Amino acid sequence: MRPILDLEIEASSGSSSSQVASNLSPVGEDYKPISLNLSLSFNNNNNNNLDLESSSLTLPLSSTSESSNPEQQQQQQPSVSKRVFSCNYCQRKFYSSQALGGHQNAHKRERTLAKRAMRMGLAGVFPGRGSSSNYAAAATAAALSCLPLHGSGNGNMTSFRTLGIRAHSSAHDVSMTRQTPETLIRNIARFNQGYFGNCIPFYVEDDEAEMLWPGSFRQATNAVAVEAGNDNLGERKMDFLDVKQAMDMESSLPDLTLKL
């Protein structure tokens, strides 16, 4: 005989077992590995339980995703501000103290060179205190105009401009060719406690000027025309009288010829 199977009882027992298995959901705070229920059920109430299980599965996944990205957490933290060092001369900013120290040492070297050139320039401008050469003063002034003085502004150059030194024109200084009256007097020959001509040095050559020697048979008009460049009238008369005196002396000599 065949056994009689009651399908209604088996279906009801299967549904009850599925309900019991589906109701087993984690409630505690500590999440443990969850086993998924793959059994099929025909009750509509089981949909809510599946939603709870899916939500419980998503929570640990989100926590692991946050812990697996430490770079994002570092980006969210506030960035530390870098220290900035500023120069005392030109207010330039540096990010390291070593770079600032080298920059300020360059400023100090420029300042020492400027002071040295200033002393040399003052010694050339005031001859009593140092070198009396005007060329040295012009050279030092030209060197001063080329110095790059960072952070000092135009203070140093204005102090030199008050002394009469101008940039880009000291090389063509006219004062080198000028001479004081004292130096001109020293270079002039003295005759009879006076000076020759209108302060003209004796070494100046004049092509038109000719010497009038005594005993020459030149006419007086030519003698005056030769010395027309001279402004001193007394000297012209003196030369003319000297010629006449020389001619009279020759005529006043005694005649020593023998006459028979």
Curated annotation (Swiss-Prot):
Q: What is its main location?
A: nucleus
GO CC terms of this entry: nucleus
Q: What Gene Ontology molecular function terms does this protein carry?
A: DNA-binding transcription factor activity; transcription cis-regulatory region binding; zinc ion binding
Note down the stretches annotated as region Disordered.
Answer: 1-24, 51-82
The miscellaneous annotation reads: Seeds over-expressing ZFP4 are insensitive to inhibition of germination by abscisic acid (ABA).
Q: Spell out the PANTHER family in the cross-references.
A: C2H2 AND C2HC ZINC FINGERS SUPERFAMILY PROTEIN, TRANSCRIPTION FACTOR C2H2 FAMILY
Q: A Gene Ontology biological process annotation? A: abscisic acid-activated signaling pathway
Zinc fingers typed C2H2-type, residue spans: 85-107
Against Gene3D superfamilies, the record matches this protein to: Classic Zinc Finger
- Compositional bias per record (Low complexity), positions renumbered to this chain: 12-24, 51-79
Question: Which purpose does this protein serve, as stated in its record?
Answer: Acts as a negative regulator of abscisic acid (ABA) signaling during germination and early seedling development.
What SUPFAM superfamilies does the entry give?
Answer: beta-beta-alpha zinc fingers
Q: Which UniProt keywords apply?
A: Abscisic acid signaling pathway, Metal-binding, Nucleus, Zinc, Zinc-finger
Supply the source organism for this entry: Arabidopsis thaliana
User: Which gene specifies this protein's sequence?
Assistant: ZFP4
Q: Return the protein name.
A: Zinc finger protein 4
**Disruption outcome:** No visible phenotype under normal growth conditions, but mutant seeds are hypersensitivite to inhibition of germination by abscisic acid (ABA).
Which InterPro entries does UniProt cross-reference here?
ZFP3-like (IPR044246), Znf_C2H2_sf (IPR036236), Znf_C2H2_type (IPR013087)
Spell out the subcellular localization from the entry: Nucleus
